Amino acid sequence: MTRDVRQLFGTDGVRGRANFEPMTVETSVLLGKAIAGVLLEKHAGKHRVVVGKDTRLSGYMFENALIAGLTSMGIETLMLGPIPTPGVAFITRAYRADAGIMISASHNPYRDNGIKIFSSDGFKIGQAVEERIEAMVASKDFGKLPDDHAVGKNKRVKDATGRYIEYAKATFPKGRTLKGLRIVLDCAHGATYRVAPSVFEELDAEVICYGCEPSGCNINAGCGALWPSTIQKAVIEHKADVGIALDGDGDRLIMVDEKGHIVDGDMLLSICASDLKRRQALSDNRVVATVMTNFGVLRYLESLGIQVTISPVGDRHVLQHMLENQAVLGGEQSGHMIFLDYNTTGDGIVSALQVLRIMIESESTLSDLTACIAKSPQALINVPVTKKVPLESLANVQGVLKEVKEVLGDSGRILLRYSGTENICRVMVEGTKKHQVDSLAKTIVDVVEAEIGAEISE
């Protein structure tokens, strides 16, 4: 079956329910061959691709399928095993590989899986390369197959996680430790379940672990960055200094202060931007945030003399705007933070280390660091939908948006958008009064659910 261009790739690689198109073994083999074909178009000869994955049960079959496609075209593959997405980006550069592949659906439930592709420089491939891969999959024209003696070899890399652990620790100031800090750590039963505890423990922190027992079917299930309530309770129970919640593939970070209050990506971005400016390490005094960033946070950054470039939601868009504006720091409310001085993609562990460093150097608690940031009341509700109908075509939805805008006036805003990776419509309302914001968001949600809402299935 032929596919239209852009039918495979979404906003963050290929993603979908395991064993349903496009996330099938058959399509994964074709993707492996197409990735190889694109590499061989650049130049003939030897090529090397690293392949990592998170802890989903379906990761095994997609790992084998992709490697089969790659090696059938003469590509050498290096299996990294379970490793965070930023670890794949790092190892791709460290091993001078021609590409890196991460098998993960990030924060999605275990039933989903996905494929993210990195170029040799550790950045995610661009749209032009994605479209070339799609075209090859559709035509099944991957170029000449190698002779039987020239098929690729597959090797397992035993020290990949160890190298990533050392890299992450090296982003923390030499000679400093986390001694005296008690940390509650939630790894979402995901790709960081081995490396994150090791990083913080080897820096002498006392670590209390949650979400570190993956079964293949429990990744992101009531834990991790999407469910910080787990560590909110644990921080209070264990009298910890801080809580750290990562998502399934380790590129997101949400923290909890010593009082049990959630510190989201907006707040963490503000803390890190302020620190970089103080140290005169913030290029052009600029950070990149997104359309979802809280207005109170934007006002705080501007009060510090920090310029804010606004991008669409998604770490790919954040990175693009960072590169265009030569910014070294960017992030979004969901917890993606990119420190270009350290890595080419979001890295939850490295981001956490930077916040912990700031706490130690300033002799402050996390609540001290957030005390001066006054967030605007905001409601964000995810609505499961049956399909992503253009929102502008839904008369009732447009009608309620108009009504809510009239109520808010100039003192608030509404953002209604589909998720790029799930069948979800995100409803965000921001204003000056919490009860009003919550009520107006619920009003919009009710109409969206009536028009295109879906039953939640497990």
Curated annotation (Swiss-Prot):
GO terms for biological process: carbohydrate metabolic process; peptidoglycan biosynthetic process; UDP-N-acetylglucosamine biosynthetic process. The active site is at S106. It comes from the Bacteria. Its cofactor is Mg(2+). It is an enzyme of class 5 (isomerase). GO terms for molecular function: magnesium ion binding; phosphoglucosamine mutase activity; phosphomannomutase activity. GO terms for cellular component: cytosol. The modification Phosphoserine is found at S106. Its EC number is 5.4.2.10. The keyword Metal-binding applies. CDD domains: GlmM. Transmembrane segments: none annotated. Binds 1 Mg(2+) ion per subunit. The keyword Magnesium applies. It catalyses: alpha-D-glucosamine 1-phosphate = D-glucosamine 6-phosphate. Mg(2+) binds at S106, D247, D249, D251. Activated by phosphorylation. It holds the Pfam family PGM_PMM_III. Keywords: Isomerase, Magnesium, Metal-binding, Phosphoprotein. NCBIfam families: glmM, PRK10887.1. Belongs to the phosphohexose mutase family. Catalyzes the conversion of glucosamine-6-phosphate to glucosamine-1-phosphate. This is Phosphoglucosamine mutase. It comes from Chlamydia trachomatis serovar D (strain ATCC VR-885 / DSM 19411 / UW-3/Cx).
